[in-house]
């Protein structure tokens, strides 16, 4: 992947960026780019080695009352209680630097921390997006599956890689830090200064008919990498998972128990898991 980004910030907390990007996704023996064509009951397959796209992305960001702490290398926002709004649109151009498709892809994001005084705070992330054109599955909206045992923001701990494909979605990521609301009432535990954490993540998704390839005649699309196509897109029920955990163990450790709430009957999935995080917070 190669990209060039120009960013402009204004004093009214508004900024925009323009990105030129060329990206190539290469097939492997595990994830193949296969097209099929059936004639007179005989199905033939052709395989592409890669998928190339060239696109322009325009992004808008508005963060009222945002403040930063900055050093020589980077900067960090110190006002998470104020909202951040993001809006971006990608336009793909066929025929430029090997690009094979024309397409449009729109994304929206909202970030904010809600304080509840002595009852802690909740970090809220709301996102939505849509791919407007017919495109092969590497260019669809694929949820971020966390395949590790660590806690990762904006990812799903119990979702398999490429388990669901979407061309439109709406998602949420809620993390409630209770600030010792319950554990501080237990005398011996109170001295440890442990902190309770509850997470709730989920996604509504949809894959339109134009982006659902026929296994016997895919046309310009690729076959999905799984034989069971019901595994590849969400129904009316959203994907959801919930987690409960304890943070500030030995001042650096957080441990979560995560449980998958929906689509629990699919083959090869994890219904629950343990995730950890190491980090020092000030």
Q: Which residue stretches match the model-derived regions?
A:
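Exposed, low-structure sequence patches enriched in small/polar residues
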Residues: 1-282
């Amino acid at each position: 992947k190669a990209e060039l980004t120009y960013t402009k910030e204004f004093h009214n907390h508004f900024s925009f960026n323009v990105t030129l990007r060329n990206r190539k996704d290469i097939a492997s023996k595990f994830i193949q780019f296969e097209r099929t064509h059936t004639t007179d009951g005989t199905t033939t397959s052709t395989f592409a080695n890669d998928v190339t796209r060239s696109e322009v992305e325009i992004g808008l960001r508005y963060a009222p009352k945002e403040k930063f702490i900055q050093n020589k290398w980077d900067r960090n926002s110190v006002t998470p209680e104020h909202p951040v709004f993001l809006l971006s649109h990608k336009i793909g151009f066929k025929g430029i630097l090997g690009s094979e498709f024309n397409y449009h892809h729109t994304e929206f994001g909202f970030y904010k921390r809600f304080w509840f005084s002595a009852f802690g705070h909740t970090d809220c992330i709301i996102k939505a997006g849509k791919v407007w054109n017919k495109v092969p599955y590497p260019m669809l909206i694929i949820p971020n599956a966390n395949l590790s045992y660590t806690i990762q923001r904006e990812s799903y701990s119990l979702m398999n890689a490429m388990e669901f494909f979407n061309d439109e979605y709406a998602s949420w990521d809620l993390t409630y830090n209770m600030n010792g609301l319950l554990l501080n009432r237990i005398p011996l535990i109170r001295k440890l200064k442990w902190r309770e954490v509850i997470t709730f993540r989920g996604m509504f998704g949809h894959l339109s008919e134009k982006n659902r390839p026929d296994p016997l005649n895919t046309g310009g699309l690729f076959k999905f990498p799984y034989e069971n196509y019901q595994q590849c897109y969400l129904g009316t029920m959203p994907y959801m998972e919930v987690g409960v955990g304890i943070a500030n163990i030995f001042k650096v450790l957080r441990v979560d128990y995560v449980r998958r709430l929906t689509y629990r009957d699919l083959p090869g999935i994890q219904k629950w898991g343990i995730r950890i995080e190491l980090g020092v917070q000030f």
